[in-house]
Structure formats: C-alpha cells, structure tokens
Amino acid sequence: MSTNEIKNDYSAKEETAGPGDSNTSEIKTSDVYKVDKNLPSRFNNPDCFRYSHKTTNPLYRTTNQAYGSKKPTVHEMPTSFNGSRHRFSEHLLKSGMYRDNGFNTMLDKSRLSRPNETSVFYDRINFHSLYHTAGKS
C-alpha cells in the first residue's frame, strides 16, 4: 500500500465520520505505521488533542493561524520517541527550586543619581547629570 493510498483511505474515513458520531472508531498511528513499543499514547492517538476553532476575520488571518487550527493526523505524528533522562533536574523535583531569601542592603549605583543624593529623583531640573557638565548638581 503506497503513502497516497493510505492518505486517501484516511481522508475517506474522516469524511464519513461526523462530529456527533460517538460509535466511530478513532484511527491510531499504529494502525497505519509501524511504531515503537515505547511510544506514548498521545502520539499513537492524534484525536486526544482537542482543538477548538475560533472564528476570525479572514482578512487578518495569518498562515500560522491557518496551519495551527488543523488537527494533527496520523501522518504528522511521530512513530518513535526517545525521551531524555531527567538526571539534571531530579534533585529539583525532590527539594524544589533554589530561592534566595537574602535581604539586599547595598546602595544602588546609577548614573542618574549619586549614592549620597536621595532627593534627586524628585527634583525635575537637576534630575539628569548630563544637564550639569560643569559641576555637581
């Protein structure tokens, strides 16, 4: 069976099954392709992804919105899954993320205000140091 025949067969099943038919059998990736034994069920069953269709003005509809609004078919689903080890983040799952609860007592250094001047922010004329190049503001 060629790929075109598989696609035509699948699209014919899609057309005959109505949205309200609850007795229709969902086609799985393993029915069409050879899949790995450790493939997660969400990849074997593309109908588990629930898509809602929001009506938008066609004038403002982008190509990403048009492509993303379509449900995935078995032909777009992966047939193998190679999960990574979680050795890097296992200790974070047990103890939680690091959080610094320290109290900052250092003065903030800024070009706009000098450390010994606290009322500079409230003075609209002497606010910026570039206005006064000759001397101290």
Curated annotation (Swiss-Prot):
Location of the region described as Disordered in the Swiss-Prot/TrEMBL record: 1-29, 62-83
Any GO BP annotation: determination of left/right symmetry
Membrane-spanning intervals of the chain: none
Basic and acidic residues composition bias: residue spans: 1-16
InterPro entries, alphabetized: PIRC1/2
PANTHER family named among the record's database cross-references: PIERCE HOMOLOG (PTHR20899), PIERCER OF MICROTUBULE WALL 1 PROTEIN (PTHR20899:SF1)
Protein's recorded name: Piercer of microtubule wall 2 protein
